[in-house]
Amino acid sequence: MAIDFSKYIASVKDFPNKGIVFRDITPILQDGELYRIATHELAEYAKSRKADVIVGPEARGFIVGCPVATELGLGFVPARKPHKLPREVERASYDLEYGSNSLEMHKDAIKPGQRVVLCDDLMATAGTLRASKELIENLGGKLVGAAFYIELPDLKGREKLPDVDIYSLVQYHGA
């Protein structure tokens, strides 16, 4: 039975800034069975892409990616905000739909040739995905797919990274 996950995603207007509609996944996370099913859907996608490792950007990418990695018996690599990792890092900057930031990964986090699937809660402008892809490739890995709970197609993230296979549970048009 297919689940319409959009029924369990809260839409919060003017958060974190006026004019933004924030898509809140916490109702899914609060329901153990829904969370398990959403995790399984993303894990099946990662399995189909023959992933060797899962990457999740801070912070909600940890919530989405860690259980996917666990279900598949794969390692998980966090892409962290600056100055959170204790060892030598690779860094890439990106723009968000409402700001800018950087991501870092330990230089030894991805092995050369590893097939990587990124998991996160939402793809909007693809800024986080683009920065993560840069990090993965700089470390010698290959981004073979990206899986999201939510995609905002009107922000044209797919168009910005046409070489990346993208999977999402829910798409919100006109958002």
UniProtKB/Swiss-Prot annotation:
Homodimer. GO terms for cellular component: cytoplasm. The gene is apt. The lineage of its organism: Bacteria, Bacillati, Bacillota, Bacilli, Lactobacillales. Its EC number is 2.4.2.7. It holds the Pfam family Pribosyltran. This is Adenine phosphoribosyltransferase. One of its GO terms (molecular function) is adenine phosphoribosyltransferase activity. Signal peptide: none annotated. PANTHER family: ADENINE PHOSPHORIBOSYLTRANSFERASE (PTHR32315:SF3). Pathway: Purine metabolism; AMP biosynthesis via salvage pathway; AMP from adenine: step 1/1. Keywords: Cytoplasm, Glycosyltransferase, Purine salvage, Transferase. The keyword Transferase applies. It is found in: Cytoplasm. It comes from Lactobacillus helveticus (strain DPC 4571). InterPro entries: Ade_phspho_trans (IPR005764), PRibTrfase_dom (IPR000836), PRTase-like (IPR029057), UPRTase/APRTase (IPR050054). GO terms for biological process: adenine salvage; AMP salvage; purine ribonucleoside salvage. Catalyzes a salvage reaction resulting in the formation of AMP, that is energically less costly than de novo synthesis. The keyword Cytoplasm applies. It catalyses: AMP + diphosphate = 5-phospho-alpha-D-ribose 1-diphosphate + adenine. It comes from the Bacteria.
